[in-house]
Amino acid sequence: MKLHRLALTNYRGIAHRDVEFPDHGVVVVCGANEIGKSSMVEALDLLLEYKDRSTKKEVKQVKPTNADVGSEVIAEISSGPYRFVYRKRFHKRCETELTVLAPRREQLTGDEAHERVRTMLAETVDTELWHAQRVLQAASTAAVDLSGCDALSRALDLAAGDDAALSGTESLLIERIEAEYARYFTPTGRPTGEWSAAVSRLAAAEAAVADCAAAVAEVDDGVRRHTELTEQVAELSQQLLAHQLRLEAARVAAEKIAAITDDAREAKLIATAAAATSGASTAAHAGRLGLLTEIDTRTAAVVAAEAKARQAADEQATARAEAEACDAALTEATQVLTAVRLRAESARRTLDQLADCEEADRLAARLARIDDIEGDRDRVCAELSAVTLTEELLSRIERAAAAVDRGGAQLASISAAVEFTAAVDIELGVGDQRVSLSAGQSWSVTATGPTEVKVPGVLTARIVPGATALDFQAKYAAAQQELADALAAGEVADLAAARSADLCRRELLSRRDQLTATLAGLCGDEQVDQLRSRLEQLCAGQPAELDLVSTDTATARAELDAVEAARIAAEKDCETRRQIAAGAARRLAETSTRATVLQNAAAAESAELGAAMTRLACERASVGDDELAAKAEADLRVLQTAEQRVIDLADELAATAPDAVAAELAEAADAVELLRERHDEAIRALHEVGVELSVFGTQGRKGKLDAAETEREHAASHHARVGRRARAARLLRSVMARHRDTTRLRYVEPYRAELHRLGRPVFGPSFEVEVDTDLRIRSRTLDDRTVPYECLSGGAKEQLGILARLAGAALVAKEDAVPVLIDDALGFTDPERLAKMGEVFDTIGADGQVIVLTCSPTRYGGVKGAHRIDLDAIQ
């Protein structure tokens, strides 16, 4: 299968795109992110797999959001002997068109065209291989599964050197075996289809036999229950008659007891009324006697209360006099304490003022010392600021002076020395210098540079040194200039002056540091402004009239101690008098309270006595004392007679055993009620069983049981026949599975060898992989280090996934080949391996079609023979 052309119109965000692909080689389709590269693969799948009227989510989601139009996909494909142009429009005005160009021209539309394409692809394309030969963004690192690719299996059979001739129908045979197996079992091995129906039929037949047998047993049980219920009804009728006679006898005895009980209840009511009357008259007589006793008692209590009140009044007067004396003594002690406290406060204030004066003197001396040191430090800092020479400038001057000395020595060592000896008195001119020589006197000059010597009016001699000397002269001049610049920057005349100035600077720095340290020690943790503020506060707090000459700190402290001692003594005396006064006041309050309480009590007793005497006079006016006593005695005799009547009736009632009679009546009634309910229930159950038996007689349950047993025999026979076929299909499938596994073991080695051939240029000569029977890569070995596939980096997984697909593409026969689609892979790969992967692409591209979609075309720059398509240029 080869893809020659793909055109998209109104597909997602793509308005129109038409891309043509070469028949073989590597095609790199590049474009920016979200330009629609992955949409091209998606569009090809929609074209081949879905009808134009499909309403599935995959089709709906590609409709453009900015226009109400249909999405259109056109592809030109060759597969086996066929070459065709296939077009579909989805969503709006749905259309399907097919033009077959080879082997003979055909034109079809609609579902007929769709089915024709699927038929051609089913004949010529290994669908599993077509889907496996893709590296998509969403699963670029997943291990590829090539086990279901028949085209690759045939190729690996040939590569493995299988002696058996391939007929091309192996896959069809396996499919037929799988189809036969699927008639009886699900993929997980559970019964399904005909086998499941046979199992279900047998189970249903056995359940029907069980149900019918249960129904027949139910009829037998109904006959047995009818007999038992008939006997039970007769027995319950006899028991009910006997218990009804027992109930009647119990009722007669209960009625007799009820009559006695009524008489006893009436007697109790009479006795209760007599008791109430007797109680009232007795209570009235007792109340009269109690009132007389109360009057006598209250008279004595009034006399005693008045005596106690008089005594409490005397005690109150005594306590008041004592309290007044204690209060006067407390007032005197308080005045003495106040005077002593004033003296103590004055002495303490005098001592604090003396301490503040001493602290002010110390602070003044300290601040004077600080001011002197700050003045010295400011003078040192001023002298330091006047020194422009720094340590760096000194180092620069020393380096420049050393360079001048070295340059002068080198220049002197290579320069010519010219000596003049005057025969007569003569004057020489050397530059701006005039030299006078007397006869016989000598003078020499070193020619470090071009030098002119003139004898005025006689000659001019020019001495020119060599090139080396000129170079040294230039360096010497530069060194001198550097020295002059450094001296000027340091404002010194020469090196000695610079060193002297540096020594002076160091001494000034040391002096400044000493003064700073001394100043820090004097200030401590406080700032100078704080010290000055404290001094001002101390000075401002001193009174103008304080005589500090006549008083010293020791005298003031002694006076304060004496006054404090007097204050403490006065406080103790005051506290003692306060406690005494408080005790006297407390006693006065207690006696006053007691006197008041006793006076109130005497008044209350007198009032109660008057009230009692008034109440007695009122009662005597109504009933006299003798009449009240006679009535209480008569009511008591009536009560005794009524109580005796109650006792007699209670004895008579006890003799009849009312509890036993009531229990017998209740037991007999319960027994009759229970037997009546059981009798009625038995009659009802007997009727229901009779009705059920009459219904069972019309249902033919025995016949149904015979029919169910016959159906079970037929179902068991059918179950056995289908079971034999199902087991045979399962056995054949397991044999073919073992054969397929054995065959796949032969596939592994040629596939693994092809992987090694393609992978060693990328990973190196030590590259090896382990492949399972499903042709999945399980591990990779480099330099004798084996790493499971799941533990590899994302880049290594991508590279192995691409190599696995390229190996499959290299192995399949030319007529079975499908395009290898790679969607934006190798993003995790370093540049060196990218170049090596490019060589592998070139190798595979020579025989097959490899389509690479990428947003970074530089990744595939190593693919020398690639055909490149820029989507940005064809938008």
Curated annotation (Swiss-Prot):
Please name the InterPro entries in this protein's record: AAA_GajA/Old/RecF-like (IPR041685), P-loop_NTPase (IPR027417)
One of the Pfam families matching this protein, by short name: AAA_15
One GO CC annotation: plasma membrane
Record-linked PANTHER family: DOUBLE-STRAND BREAK REPAIR RAD50 ATPASE, PUTATIVE-RELATED (PTHR41259:SF1)
Q: What protein does this entry describe?
A: Uncharacterized protein Rv1278
The organism's taxonomy opens as: Bacteria, Bacillati, Actinomycetota, Actinomycetes, Mycobacteriales
